[in-house]
Amino acid sequence: MKKIEAIAFDMYGTLYDVHSVVDACEKQYPGKGKDISVLWRQKQLEYAWLRCLMGQYIKFEEATANALTYTCNQMKLDCDEGSAMRLTEEYLRLKPFPEVRGALRALRQRGMRLAILSNGSTETIHDVVHNSGVEGEFEHLISVDSARAYKPHPLAYELGEEAFGISRESILFVSSNPWDVSGAKAFGYQVCWINRYGFAFDELGQTPDFTVPVMDAIVHLIAV
């Protein structure tokens, strides 16, 4: 196993809690916030992947908006244009998990090169990172838009290798999403799965090199 020279992080669900939109959903639709958030996220990913398979790539934000429309229709909720816009804008204000800021700072202090490699658009990645005050921690903010393919497609992971300018075997890819970890491992990255909730790992023919419960543990991995 090669020495780790750089780390690429997934954004949604790894650095940032996608279910931090629950409060906004609950305010809009009392008693239904959590259910909306769960179905919305499920359809967001599903629509992105299906569009990719269909050869009809759209930006992740459009897939997010479409997923919200489906969710409201499925749950028989009235959702006018203004309400939909307010909820989708919550994805620009996602909250980082509690340990993220400290872990990023510690990794940078150890001289580690850091990047985000996300299915989100360039504009959204910049907005989310800026709004959470951690933009100075990253060397690269990488969107899959230039590849026009969503993770876990190999073309998406290739962007991280190109940005860092080093071999994929020297890059650690970190995600809390098993499908993302599997895609990155198949591409050739070293991979770390953040398993915050004690889930079983997906049976996709890949195994993470490291599994940690929270992001702080990555700092100790690098220090070894």
Curated annotation (Swiss-Prot):
InterPro entries: 2-HAD (IPR006328), HAD-like_sf (IPR036412), HAD-SF_hydro_IA (IPR006439), HAD_sf (IPR023214), PGP-like_dom2 (IPR023198), S-2-haloacid_dehalogenase (IPR051540)
Gene3D superfamilies: HAD superfamily/HAD-like, Putative phosphatase, domain 2
EC number: 3.8.1.3
Keywords, alphabetical: Hydrolase, Plasmid
GO molecular function: haloacetate dehalogenase activity
SUPFAM superfamilies registered for this protein in UniProt: HAD-like
Origin: domain of life: Bacteria
Active site, UniProt feature: 10 (nucleophile)
Coiled coil feature spans: none
Catalyzed reaction equations: a haloacetate + H2O = a halide anion + glycolate + H(+)
Protein family according to the UniProt entry: Belongs to the HAD-like hydrolase superfamily. S-2-haloalkanoic acid dehalogenase family.
Miscellaneous comment in the UniProt entry for this protein: Two haloacetate dehalogenase enzymes exist in Moraxella strain B. DehH1 acts predominantly on fluoroacetate, dehH2 acts on chloro-, bromo- and iodoacetate, but not on fluoroacetate.
Protein name: Haloacetate dehalogenase H-2
Species per Swiss-Prot/TrEMBL record: Moraxella sp. (strain B)
Name of the coding gene: dehH2
